């Protein structure tokens, strides 16, 4: 019985090696500074920092819009 379990375990490890599983150390690091380069709403000339939105329509590229 034990030899059958050993053979089954060996086959499973050969088919699905532990290196195929992504561990936490293999994950990409989160880089908030890189993400902020794509989002430039705060630097938009029509952005109102008090309201935290734009008074103009969203079609001009400033989001979030104050107007519906």
UniProtKB/Swiss-Prot annotation:
Residues 21-52 form a propeptide. Residues 1-20 form the signal peptide. The keyword Secreted applies. It is found in: Secreted. Disulfide bonds join 53-66, 54-62, 58-65. Keywords: Cleavage on pair of basic residues, Disulfide bond, Hydroxylation, Neurotoxin, Secreted, Signal, Toxin. One of its GO terms (cellular component) is extracellular region. The modification 4-hydroxyproline is found at residue 64. InterPro entries: Conotoxin (IPR004214). The keyword Signal applies. Belongs to the conotoxin M superfamily. The cysteine framework is III (CC-C-C-CC). Classified in the M-2 branch, since 2 residues stand between the fourth and the fifth cysteine residues. This is Conotoxin TsMMSK-021. It comes from Conus tessulatus (Tessellate cone).
